[in-house]
Regions:
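ATP-binding/phosphotransfer module of carbohydrate and carboxylate kinases, centering on a glycine-rich
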Residues: 2-142
Length: 142
């Protein structure tokens, strides 16, 4: 959208994104992204394309991944601070962090800067398994 309205310079990334979204003008892009059905999922489906372009050396795509990694690390930093966790183990369960190497690498680098000692780890199970594990550790109250 920033390229469409002139806030950012035109780049090959814009063309790739517009092709993926099947739009051919700034007006079509703006109309698409405000549709109720587009939402966060509409932007999220572009993540693999941005990750791929970044790994091909596109500096604009790399900047998007860097900002995204920093934003994720900032959220971890805030939560860890509120919970007084010095070096938390972080289980990223969203598809983008699990499946997009460029994003995961940016997140991990930013995490090391914002939360020294924190580490990414694969979850041992899903949310239900975690809830059952916590329930098993909690004494029964009658």
């Amino acid at each position: 959208v920033q390229m469409a309205d002139g806030r950012l310079a035109e780049t090959p990334l814009r063309g790739a994104l517009w092709q993926a979204l099947e739009v051919d003008s700034p007006q079509a892009l703006k109309a698409l992204v405000v549709q109720p059905h587009f939402g966060a999922a509409g932007f999220a489906r572009l993540a693999p394309l941005v990750d791929q372009r970044a790994q091909m050396g596109d500096p604009h795509a790399a900047a998007v991944l860097q900002r995204s990694g920093e934003a994720l690390a900032g959220m971890v930093h805030t939560v860890a601070g509120q919970l007084d966790l010095a070096a938390p183990a972080v289980c990223a369960v969203g598809g983008a962090v699990l499946h997009l190497g460029g994003l995961r690498d940016c997140f991990e680098r930013a995490l090391m800067q914002r939360c020294p000692g924190a580490r990414l780890q694969r979850p041992a199970g899903d949310a239900c398994a975690g809830a059952l594990h916590l329930a098993a550790q909690t004494p029964l109250r009658c």
